[in-house]
Structure formats: structure tokens, C-alpha cells
Amino acid sequence: SNLKAEGEIDERDFLDRAELLCKLGQTVMISNFQEYFKVVEYFSNYSKARMGLAMGVSNLVEIFDEKYYRHLSGGILEAFGKLFYRDLKVYLYPMKDENGNVVTSENLKVHPRMKELYKFFKFNGKVIDIKDYDEKNLDIFSRKVLKMICKGETGWEELLPEGTAEVIKKEKLFSYACELDLKEPEGIK
């Protein structure tokens, strides 16, 4: 995930996300790579095995934005050469657009200059849709859940996978503080 997508990284949020994933039994890799092709290039130094990246539609659309590759002499073509080296596949998680339509690799929109490049990767099987998803989950956004937690709103627990809310509460992640924690003990003013 690119946590810098909305500007500067909130260090506490970043560490809480990593801690939550670890507590849920997931492996977390933290790096200073801001481009996907650099992550792939790094792992290519240690493994000859085929690699895959799972990402959401919005992340894939961003990958096709030339502004991220201006510092490379070969521009976006150099980056994509490194990214798709060794038959890398992108497994694409859908999203809903502003009209509520599900966006997949079949109907996503990239900049007109990138359209043919995207079609090349799609046609050659480099972009594969994740089909096993629950459409109701496409209406849940981490930023919304985080705001609910920080404001002390109810209902955020139901938006998360089983066991996740319990870890957030127990470890007091994302500024979570339940009412019991906010009450002062009897006799203290």
C-alpha cells in the first residue's frame, strides 16, 4: 500500500497498521521504496520465482501516471520494463466508481496517452482481476473507518474482518479509546 498517497505519512498510523497486520498473523515488509518497480527489482535480486502484486484499481491507475517516472532516463517504459520483468502479474481488486459501478481491469480508465500501453499489459495477461470478492466490501474505505475510530463513533467494528476490531481495542491502535478507558476512577477529580 502506498501510505503517502494523500501527502505526508502519519507515522503513528503507519506503525499501527503494521502492528495490526502482525498481530493478525500477517507478514509485514516496510521499505523506503515508493515505486512498485523498485520493490520488484529488489526481490528479483533474491528470487528467480515468478512474482505477483495485489493492488486496488486506484493504485494501478496511479502506476500509469507518467509523473512518477520523470526522473528515469527511460521514463515510464523503463519503470514498466523493471516492473513486469520475469513475467510479473498484477492481481487487481475492484472498486466502485462515483456512480456505484464496479470498476475492474475491463473498464478502468487510464490517461488517453497510456491507453495502448495498458491494453498491451491487459491483453498479455499481466493484469488479472480478482473475482472472489464481496461487493458490499467495496463500500468500505480505511480512511472512513479510521475517522470513525478517532471520533469515537460506533459501528466501525462491523466494517472490519473478524478479529480485527478486538486487536485494535486491546492494543489501543489508531487512537482507539473506549468509554471505559476515558472514565476517571471513583474519588479522583
Question: Language-model features: where?
Answer:
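Nucleotidyltransferase catalytic core that binds NTPs
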Residues: 1-189
